[in-house]
């Protein structure tokens, strides 16, 4: 049985109040279905206008895998902050670990990435999440990420 939803839709305005990231390094557009079990889904609409496509790769644009991992971490940060504070409260989020990372399929301009994140552990300010990045329901990347939330 799925855990109840705490926050159904965290829009870009709430994300901007929650995370310190800004263009060009804010890599999520919204977070949906933040549940009481510290899970949720980040959404990223990939556009050809992304700055990364100027060099990755000009003749065949592919969204960089490392940016997907950062999108997972940002999604986890929003889930952690909003779950602890009950609202968007600015916090610094320090990305600490990446484990079991795999890239499965390329992500192209026009794709929408869903970052399915679920907490797999927490100790004080430290959080660990497992994430699957999906496009059209197909896993394109996966990783376990760790972060520290501070005031």
Curated annotation (Swiss-Prot):
Its EC number is 4.2.1.59. GO terms for cellular component: cytoplasm; membrane. The keyword Lipid metabolism applies. Pfam families: FabA. One of its GO terms (biological process) is fatty acid biosynthetic process. GO terms for molecular function: (3R)-hydroxyacyl-[acyl-carrier-protein] dehydratase activity. The active site is at residue 56. Its main location: cytoplasm. Keywords: Cytoplasm, Lipid A biosynthesis, Lipid biosynthesis, Lipid metabolism, Lyase. CDD domains: FabZ. It is found in: Cytoplasm. It catalyses: a (3R)-hydroxyacyl-[ACP] = a (2E)-enoyl-[ACP] + H2O. The keyword Lipid biosynthesis applies. It is an enzyme of class 4 (lyase). Belongs to the thioester dehydratase family. FabZ subfamily. NCBIfam families: fabZ, PRK00006.1. PANTHER family: 3-HYDROXYACYL-[ACYL-CARRIER-PROTEIN] DEHYDRATASE. Involved in unsaturated fatty acids biosynthesis. Catalyzes the dehydration of short chain beta-hydroxyacyl-ACPs and long chain saturated and unsaturated beta-hydroxyacyl-ACPs. HAMAP family: FabZ (MF_00406). This is 3-hydroxyacyl-[acyl-carrier-protein] dehydratase FabZ. It comes from Rhodopseudomonas palustris (strain BisA53). The lineage of its organism: Bacteria, Pseudomonadati, Pseudomonadota, Alphaproteobacteria, Hyphomicrobiales.
